[in-house]
Amino acid sequence: MINIRKTHPLMKIVNNAFIDLPAPSNISSWWNFGSLLGICLILQILTGLFLAMHYTPDTTTAFSSVTHICRDVNYGWIIRYMHANGASMFFICLFMHVGRGLYYGSYTFLETWNIGVILLFATMATAFMGYVLPWGQMSFWGATVITNLLSAIPYIGTNLVEWIWGGFSVDKATLTRFFAFHFIFPFIIAALAMVHLLFLHETGSNNPTGIPSDTDKIPFXXXXXIKDILGAILLILILMLLVLFTPDLLGDPDNYTPANPLNTPPHIKPEWYFLFAYAILRSIPNKLGGVLALILSILVLVIMPLLHTSKQRSMMFRPISQCMFWILVADLLTLTWIGGQPVEHPYIIIGQLASIMYFLIILVMMPVASIIENNLLKW
């Protein structure tokens, strides 16, 4: 009898994606992050759904409703903190996943890569809108500062900002629309993730060597599935350690003060996962220039395939490029640190230098390093 797994129209799709999928035999733990991102997304949708049952998107009651969830709803506190820290885990996995793609040359799968960049933007937008919902001080002022950046767009800027606000400032209309968008976006992300996977399965996975692995493939199930489960256990372990021991470690204490349009917090800063981009934004004294640099800092990922000058795909056998890659990682960590610091003497210049370094490494130093390596290998 033919296995139903291989014949049933629905089971067949699942089978070809997660069970009988031919996987390279040498993929390392850096290939775990795709499945971990899927788990993060499911977790965020589920916890978010239960939070939405008790949350009220209204300026007068939003803050109180979050307090009510934490105090009065059964296990509301754990759902709330799983959702908040789940976002941090989501972004850790995202950065690792993108970093893996850069290191091993996975960006040569153009469709998969471009959908991935769109996914990154969508996730960042969702996280930003979610941060506004508790309606604390940092929620309100974060929303004010970031939406205001659109006013830097020539001619239509001011109208655009007021259209997004639904008024002349961040208010009730802004909160309700952000809640609506924050609810719908994860489902759009889930749909895009399926398209991401569809394009990936057209070519098959890359592997650490960057050499085609068609001659040496193994079935996904039992081998890579167990490995994914191990990754998931570790992910949930780290998440629950955060949630149960230090739930507010990554949050901002200002967000425990209800939003007050008349009182600006001394240091407005986003969640830690946006600090690198925030530092790049702040390092340029011009408003429009800063906004462009902010967008380009992420959009630069789209042109990575064009900047690939090496004859090899992966960085596994390219020590100079490896050095460049890890300098870039160090630079991003520096930017993250600077983004959380006040705009004062040593930090301003460090931020500006780190921002210049960021674009210099990606646009100049990495392609040049690749050319040098090609010449050293006489290729």
Swiss-Prot record:
<dbReference type="Pfam" id="PF00033">
    <property type="entry name" value="Cytochrome_B"/>
</dbReference>
<dbReference type="InterPro" id="IPR030689">
    <property type="entry name" value="Cytochrome_b"/>
</dbReference>
<keyword id="KW-0349">Heme</keyword>
<dbReference type="InterPro" id="IPR016174">
    <property type="entry name" value="Di-haem_cyt_TM"/>
</dbReference>
<keyword id="KW-0812">Transmembrane</keyword>
<keyword id="KW-0813">Transport</keyword>
<keyword id="KW-0479">Metal-binding</keyword>
<dbReference type="Pfam" id="PF00032">
    <property type="entry name" value="Cytochrom_B_C"/>
</dbReference>
<feature type="transmembrane region" description="Helical">
    <location>
        <begin position="347"/>
        <end position="367"/>
    </location>
</feature>
<keyword id="KW-0679">Respiratory chain</keyword>
<dbReference type="GO" id="GO:0005743">
    <property type="term" value="C:mitochondrial inner membrane"/>
</dbReference>
<feature type="binding site" description="axial binding residue">
    <location>
        <position position="83"/>
    </location>
    <ligand>
        <name>heme b b562</name>
    </ligand>
</feature>
<dbReference type="InterPro" id="IPR036150">
    <property type="entry name" value="Cyt_b/b6_C_sf"/>
</dbReference>
<feature type="binding site" description="axial binding residue">
    <location>
        <position position="196"/>
    </location>
    <ligand>
        <name>heme b b566</name>
    </ligand>
</feature>
<comment type="similarity">
    <text>Belongs to the cytochrome b family.</text>
</comment>
<keyword id="KW-0472">Membrane</keyword>
<comment type="function">
    <text>Component of the ubiquinol-cytochrome c reductase complex (complex III or cytochrome b-c1 complex) that is part of the mitochondrial respiratory chain. The b-c1 complex mediates electron transfer from ubiquinol to cytochrome c. Contributes to the generation of a proton gradient across the mitochondrial membrane that is then used for ATP synthesis.</text>
</comment>
<keyword id="KW-0999">Mitochondrion inner membrane</keyword>
<keyword id="KW-1133">Transmembrane helix</keyword>
<feature type="transmembrane region" description="Helical">
    <location>
        <begin position="320"/>
        <end position="340"/>
    </location>
</feature>
<keyword id="KW-0830">Ubiquinone</keyword>
<keyword id="KW-0496">Mitochondrion</keyword>
<feature type="transmembrane region" description="Helical">
    <location>
        <begin position="288"/>
        <end position="308"/>
    </location>
</feature>
<dbReference type="GO" id="GO:0046872">
    <property type="term" value="F:metal ion binding"/>
</dbReference>
<feature type="binding site" description="axial binding residue">
    <location>
        <position position="182"/>
    </location>
    <ligand>
        <name>heme b b562</name>
    </ligand>
</feature>
<dbReference type="InterPro" id="IPR048259">
    <property type="entry name" value="Cytochrome_b_N_euk/bac"/>
</dbReference>
<feature type="transmembrane region" description="Helical">
    <location>
        <begin position="33"/>
        <end position="53"/>
    </location>
</feature>
<dbReference type="InterPro" id="IPR005797">
    <property type="entry name" value="Cyt_b/b6_N"/>
</dbReference>
<feature type="binding site" description="axial binding residue">
    <location>
        <position position="97"/>
    </location>
    <ligand>
        <name>heme b b566</name>
    </ligand>
</feature>
<dbReference type="GO" id="GO:0045275">
    <property type="term" value="C:respiratory chain complex III"/>
</dbReference>
<keyword id="KW-0408">Iron</keyword>
<feature type="transmembrane region" description="Helical">
    <location>
        <begin position="226"/>
        <end position="246"/>
    </location>
</feature>
<dbReference type="InterPro" id="IPR005798">
    <property type="entry name" value="Cyt_b/b6_C"/>
</dbReference>
<keyword id="KW-0249">Electron transport</keyword>
<dbReference type="InterPro" id="IPR048260">
    <property type="entry name" value="Cytochrome_b_C_euk/bac"/>
</dbReference>
<feature type="binding site">
    <location>
        <position position="201"/>
    </location>
    <ligand>
        <name>a ubiquinone</name>
    </ligand>
</feature>
<dbReference type="GO" id="GO:0008121">
    <property type="term" value="F:ubiquinol-cytochrome-c reductase activity"/>
</dbReference>
<dbReference type="InterPro" id="IPR027387">
    <property type="entry name" value="Cytb/b6-like_sf"/>
</dbReference>
<feature type="transmembrane region" description="Helical">
    <location>
        <begin position="77"/>
        <end position="98"/>
    </location>
</feature>
<feature type="transmembrane region" description="Helical">
    <location>
        <begin position="113"/>
        <end position="133"/>
    </location>
</feature>
<dbReference type="GO" id="GO:0006122">
    <property type="term" value="P:mitochondrial electron transport, ubiquinol to cytochrome c"/>
</dbReference>
<feature type="transmembrane region" description="Helical">
    <location>
        <begin position="178"/>
        <end position="198"/>
    </location>
</feature>
